[in-house]
């Protein structure tokens, strides 16, 4: 809308979901909750990644890593907010201080593991009270059949 972006993503299976998809969906949802729980005013961007990694490790995926679990979004002009070194990401060890009003595309993404692939993402805004999901469909509404 007027160059503002609020991305959201869900992995959708066509037909029947593979065996284990429900467990993978729960893992991804727990990862999203951990990311949102770690986004706090005055905190560090790397804290969100660490919280997501802890969920992965607790599920037996101690060696599973991604380059980040979210990135800042908002108004976008070419080239875009989807890449480049100027984009603030929720990456391992990031010392970027989080501020009220920052908006992130947070994602909990598990692919190419010994569990079934699953992915969810939401746009969240950092408020004085923590992360608030802005996208209309929350992870709790997912149904795996």
Walk through the language-model features, giving the residues of each.
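Active-site neighborhoods and metal-handling regions in enzymes and metal-associated proteins
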Residues: 1-145
């Amino acid at each position: 809308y007027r160059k503002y972006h609020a991305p959201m993503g869900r992995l959708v299976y066509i037909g029947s979901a593979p065996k284990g998809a429900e467990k993978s969906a729960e893992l991804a949802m727990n990862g999203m909750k951990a990311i949102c729980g770690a986004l706090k005013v005055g905190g560090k961007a790397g804290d969100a990644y660490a919280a997501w990694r802890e969920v992965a490790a607790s599920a037996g995926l101690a060696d599973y890593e991604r380059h980040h679990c979210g990135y800042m979004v908002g108004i976008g002009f070419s080239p875009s907010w989807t890449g480049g070194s100027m984009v603030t990401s929720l990456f391992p060890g990031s010392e970027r201080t989080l501020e009220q009003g920052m908006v992130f595309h947070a994602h909990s993404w598990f692919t190419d593991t010994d569990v079934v692939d699953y992915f969810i993402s939401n746009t969240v805004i950092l408020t004085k009270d923590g992360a608030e999901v802005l996208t209309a469909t929350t992870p709790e509404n997912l149904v795996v059949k």
